[in-house]
Each structure stands twice: as structure tokens, then as C-alpha cells.
Amino acid sequence: MQTRATGLSKQESSRDFSKKLLKLAVAGGAAFWVTDFLMAVSPIAAAYKAAFSFSSLPVALVEALAGGMVIAFSVSFFLLRFISRLPGKNPIFKALILSFSAMVIIEVLSALGDPAHAFTYLVLDTGMNIPRILALGWTIGFVFDKQNRKV
């Protein structure tokens, strides 16, 4: 039988996990979105928008925000949950491993979605996603390291 103190301790632990998850995900999603915005106003973005049929910059930015938050929540959850099982000692490196793993999954699913143009989409999409995923992973790892640093 659980005591009330054990129940409160689990509740506190769950609340602490949720707070950390939210902070990491918001930071990572914001880094993803800022990187996407900077790329969207660059000259190379015109070819990318044409290839993926993005007609409106605001719509593309909203989609990037939603996608970045989903990826950031996923990476943050797995980093918090499985930090000790991931290779390496540095949390930034561990977050980058998770981020690039997510990118590989996304790229495979994108290629399966349109097999006729899979190679073109794979090259363009991977090239455009590397800076976004790099920013997301580095930021999540950095914030995680800051949260858990012993002073």
C-alpha cells in the first residue's frame, strides 16, 4: 500500500518532469522556428518553396512552428526519459543524436509519401532540415545541461 508521502513524491516528480519537458520543448521549438524564419527570408528559400508548393510565407512559418514543437517535444521526452542509456557524456551530443534520428525518420517517411520524386525531395529536404535540426538539438542539449548543472 502506498503512503501519502510516496504519492506526493511521485506527484512532485511527475510535475518536475513536465516542467523540464516543457522548457526543453519550447526552447528547441523556438530554435527550430527562428532557424526556419532566417532560412525563409534567404535567397535559397525560393527554390525550396517552389519544390514543396509553399505559397505563403506565414503559412509555412506556422507549419514550421507546429512541426518544430512536435519534434522538440519528442526529442525532449526521449532525452529526459533515456538520458543514461544514450551514448556519450555530453547532453548536447545526446540531444543531437536524438534530433538527427528524428530527422532520418522524417526523411524516410517523406520519401515514402511521394516515391516518384523521392530523391529530389530527400536532397532538398535534408539540406534544408540539417540547420533546423542542428539548432533544435543543440538548444535542447544546452538547456538540459543548464537545468542539471550543479553549482
PLM regions with names:
Residues 2-151:
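Juxtamembrane/disordered regions of integral membrane proteins
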